[in-house]
Amino acid sequence: MGTILDKIVEQKKKEVAELYEIYTPVKTKRKTQSLVEALQQFTVIAEVKRASPSKGDINLHVDVRKQVGTYEKCGAGAVSVLTDGQFFKGSFHDLQTAREESNIPLLCKDFIIDKIQIDRAYEAGADIILLIVAALTKEKLKELYSYVLEKGLEAIVEVHDEQELETAIVLNPHVIGINNRNLKTFEVDLSQTEKLGKRLNEEKLLWISESGIHSKEDIIRVKRAGAKGVLVGEALMTSSSISSFFEDCKVNI
């Protein structure tokens, strides 16, 4: 059967093959925005997330332009956009729309397995690329991280457990993302932030917490663990008061 992650990666291989047939990267350079700079103070990376494998449809018909505008007005330090179509109902068009609306750092959230996806994300306006350790071999991770640097972009290298963390640390990446969600089962455990955060604090690396963050209590918990930011999707996409969530994020510990 394979895990959910296995199925997603298989789909990505098909999409990459199609991209090579229909898409030619444009050789242009543009100015990019820095997530590292934004993370000098506690930052919310606010996500545009229409759907997910675990929750189904979340906010399928969201007005991306309006949502991103609200995020920026409420104080988001960066915006994340799901570009996976099959499992998350996102698109590169959503990413491009977000770029047109906002000048803050923009993350392409996808399952990146090939350089051509990075080219496509760059052209759509991304400043940051998500690289998921669980989806890549060590060699491929290193190759893609080098390519991100070559393009003048930043990377969030995402980990879920100790083994993946050690793989990520070797790269000395811009930012490490601790995903509280196990991508093999899609179960969420916020204690992963506390466990892995200790090691990252020792290494003095910049890191954020991803997934399962819904409340003021969750924000306090990840701040205490040492996170410099949070990536929040579902809670914001279903919120009746986005501004209240951002106010909760300002809590002092």
Curated annotation (Swiss-Prot):
SUPFAM superfamilies: Ribulose-phoshate binding barrel. The keyword Lyase applies. It holds the Pfam family IGPS. It is an enzyme of class 4 (lyase). Keywords: Amino-acid biosynthesis, Aromatic amino acid biosynthesis, Decarboxylase, Lyase, Tryptophan biosynthesis. Gene3D superfamilies: Aldolase class I (3.20.20.70). It catalyses: 1-(2-carboxyphenylamino)-1-deoxy-D-ribulose 5-phosphate + H(+) = (1S,2R)-1-C-(indol-3-yl)glycerol 3-phosphate + CO2 + H2O. InterPro entries: Aldolase_TIM (IPR013785), Indole-3-glycerol_P_synth (IPR045186), Indole-3-glycerol_P_synth_dom (IPR013798), Indole-3-GlycerolPSynthase_CS (IPR001468), RibuloseP-bd_barrel (IPR011060). GO terms for biological process: L-tryptophan biosynthetic process. Belongs to the TrpC family. NCBIfam families: PRK00278.1-3, PRK00278.2-4. This is Indole-3-glycerol phosphate synthase. It comes from Bacillus cereus (strain ATCC 14579 / DSM 31 / CCUG 7414 / JCM 2152 / NBRC 15305 / NCIMB 9373 / NCTC 2599 / NRRL B-3711).
